[in-house]
């Protein structure tokens, strides 16, 4: 399968796949805002979908360039499982938009993780977007390798944009380390997210 994805198909054929992921999901996006998915006659935040995944034991990694807006952060705080289990990093150089589903299918394209990009906004309000949905393993592996290179900080040492980076990926604290060090996790809506890690209080209990 190598399928051209445009406009509303980003919601119907890409975002709709997220709920059925069984093992792993990686998301790369430049911008990140609150977005919603249809549930019966209503809707729910996309974060609720991610919450269900991590509760099932699915590994979810989110890599983004910009700190999310207030609405996103407030929605995040309503899903405690995400605070503990969602893996998230921030790099201001990230401009790719991709999703890799269970290491088997990949979306590579232009749509950010926003309502107008990949969410349920209607025709006439949403962005014009374009991308490819593929199960060609050469492309899937290439996308995953590119994501992982950024995720692991492979480019940090020689990065020329350090003045714009509050905290290099190589120094971002893992959540299991936070728990072991007995730091206090501050709710994300209290202050802005701090460069790819949960805001921390260094007052140990």
Task: Enumerate the predicted regions with their spans.
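Short glycine-/acidic-enriched loop or helix-start segments at secondary-structure transitions
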Residues: 36-37, 72-74, 117-118
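Short, conserved active-site loop motifs that form the nucleotide-linked donor/cofactor pocket
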Residues: 2, 85-87
